[in-house]
Amino acid sequence: MSSMEKHLFNLKFAAKELNRNAKKCEKEEKTEKAKIKKAIQKGNTEIARIHAENAIRQKNQGINFLRMSARVDAVAARVQTAVTMGKVTKSMAGVVKSMDATLKSMNLEKISALMDKFEHQFETLDVQTQQMEDTMSNTTTLTTPQNQVDNLLHEMADEAGLDLSMELPQGQTGSVGTSVASTEQDELSQRLARLRDQV
């Protein structure tokens, strides 16, 4: 097995691993949704909110893994074409040196940077490249949009046949509009003030 064939194998393996991670996130999301229902049934809105945030975070992370899996898979196909056509250049050989460790790390930002280098090299070989959306760094934040959390809480409450509107702060039960954003900002300010008072 040549060096490039070995790297090609590793790319395909990494794509499968990323896909596996996406499925794991999907499973975790379902688990968190079940916990939301239980918490709502017990009247623990704050606990339900935490599980809703976790569910949305798992969903976003799963999407990120799927996107990166597709991107790595696309690069693997390009490597396969380049190997088949004998168009592997010296500059390409330089890019693959750090590949194995990067792919094994399952670090989305590092893999994304590696894919950037590969895609740049293939552009110079006149192989068409299709960029995915902006790299994962902006979407892997720890914060979750509150309107998504609130929507998920209501969805789980509806599925459980419960009324959650009495327990949520006013202004977050209807359609999400500009007033919700200001209400959320006010809530954040109040929570921050309470934290300061406790210190």
Swiss-Prot record:
It is found in: Cytoplasm, Cytosol; Endosome; Late endosome membrane. Keywords: Coiled coil, Cytoplasm, Endosome, Membrane, Protein transport, Transport. It comes from Xenopus laevis (African clawed frog). One of its GO terms (cellular component) is cytosol. Residues 8-42, 178-199 form a coiled coil. Belongs to the SNF7 family. GO terms for biological process: endosome transport via multivesicular body sorting pathway; late endosome to vacuole transport; protein transport. This is Charged multivesicular body protein 1b.
